[in-house]
């Protein structure tokens, strides 16, 4: 929706100041262009070349709100994704508010791992139940629904506000009839699925409490603490998932979580020590960081 126009001359003056604000505060100037692509009719190339001084610029947000929004990004470290109200994740446009964690690019690999590990699945197994525990924005649930067109995906979160966003994302991306939403803690709302689930995927809170204060201000000040705080050692939620998942997964069912740097060996050892898992694997992200751990329940 058009919210008015601004002259190229006025815009160019403000843009130069906004770039200097970014540089002075250690913010990538590309974030300014990203915001302006969402809030004006300017495209990436035009912004990169700064080829806008001699034209009128159409606005999708009011000129006052654009200026105020950028000040908020710089001064309050408020994430651009929250300002825009959306982010790109895999092939999806995901709505985000500060009720949900912003889906990270590295988390996209969690779906690649699922696809690789299940490329040889029979059609009957592909039609089974899949679960995204701690769904947040619903991004992983969308990835699972796209990967397994015949499956029913269950998205669980303890936050009603997060589930409302996840439901909206399912509708926006045409998966409203393929994903069921459940409010509660981890497996709690899925008692009716004991022994029936083909796979569980989760990006649980995994930051040790002592390290929360060291997170970037964009994260610790604005993203939900519930999605970050992993307890004293960061593995509080992961340990629950290890302990409880065999009750719900089928024999040979798939288990996959995202974790932080340095946690993979501990998670693998916890899986081994439980005696309930086989085929335990550690997977690296694109930066070669051990980011994911997968396993299967005993057959």
Swiss-Prot record:
Signal peptide feature range: none
- Say yes or no: keyword Transferase present: yes
Instruction: Tell me if Cytoplasm is a UniProt keyword of this record.
Output: no
What InterPro entries does UniProt report for this protein, alphabetically?
A: DNA_methylase_N6_adenine_CS, HemK-like, RF_glutamine_MTase_cyano, RF_methyltr_PrmC, SAM-dependent_MTases_sf, Small_mtfrase_dom
Task: Enumerate the Gene Ontology biological process terms.
Answer: methylation
Keywords, A to Z, come to: Methyltransferase, S-adenosyl-L-methionine, Transferase
Q: What is its EC number?
A: 2.1.1.297
> Which chemical reaction does it catalyze?
L-glutaminyl-[peptide chain release factor] + S-adenosyl-L-methionine = N(5)-methyl-L-glutaminyl-[peptide chain release factor] + S-adenosyl-L-homocysteine + H(+)
Q: Which Gene Ontology MF annotations are present? A: nucleic acid binding; protein-(glutamine-N5) methyltransferase activity; protein-glutamine N-methyltransferase activity
Query: Which residues are listed for substrate binding in this entry?
Result: 203-206
Fetch the Pfam families from UniProt.
Answer: MTS
Summarize where S-adenosyl-L-methionine binds, as residue positions: 134-138, 157, 186, 203
Q: Which family does it belong to?
A: Belongs to the protein N5-glutamine methyltransferase family. PrmC subfamily.
Task: Identify the PANTHER family for this entry.
Answer: PTHR47441, RELEASE FACTOR GLUTAMINE METHYLTRANSFERASE
- Protein known as: Release factor glutamine methyltransferase
Organism the protein comes from: Synechocystis sp. (strain ATCC 27184 / PCC 6803 / Kazusa)
Q: What is the lineage of its organism?
A: Bacteria, Bacillati, Cyanobacteriota, Cyanophyceae, Synechococcales
């Amino acid at each position: 929706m058009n919210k008015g126009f601004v002259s190229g001359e006025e815009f160019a003056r403000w843009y130069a100041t906004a770039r200097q604000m970014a540089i002075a505060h250690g913010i990538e100037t590309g974030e300014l262009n990203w915001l302006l692509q969402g809030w004006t009719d300017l495209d990436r190339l035009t912004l990169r070349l700064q080829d806008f001084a001699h034209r009128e610029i159409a606005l999708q947000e009011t000129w006052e709100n654009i200026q105020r929004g950028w000040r908020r990004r710089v001064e309050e470290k408020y994430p651009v994704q929250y300002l825009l109200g959306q982010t790109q994740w895999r092939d999806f446009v995901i709505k985000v508010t500060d009720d949900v964690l912003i889906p990270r690019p590295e988390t996209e690999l969690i779906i690649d791992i699922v696809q690789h590990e299940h490329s040889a699945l029979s059609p009957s197994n592909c039609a089974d139940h899949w679960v995204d525990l701690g769904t947040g924005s619903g991004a992983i649930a969308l990835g699972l629904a796209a990967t397994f067109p015949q499956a029913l995906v269950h998205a669980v979160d303890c936050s009603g506000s997060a589930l409302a966003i996840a439901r909206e994302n399912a509708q926006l991306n045409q998966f409203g009839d393929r994903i069921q939403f459940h409010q509660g803690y981890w497996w709690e709302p899925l008692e009716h699925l004991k022994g029936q689930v083909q796979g569980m995927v989760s990006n649980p809170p995994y930051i040790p409490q002592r390290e929360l204060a060291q997170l970037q201000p964009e994260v610790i000040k604005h993203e939900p603490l519930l999605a970050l705080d992993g307890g004293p050692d960061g593995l509080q939620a992961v340990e629950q998932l290890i302990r409880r998942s065999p009750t719900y997964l089928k024999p040979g069912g798939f288990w996959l979580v995202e974790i932080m740097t340095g946690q993979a060996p501990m998670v693998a050892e916890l899986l081994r020590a439980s005696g309930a898992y086989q085929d335990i694997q550690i997977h690296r992200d694109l930066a070669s960081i051990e980011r994911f751990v997968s396993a299967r329940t005993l057959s």
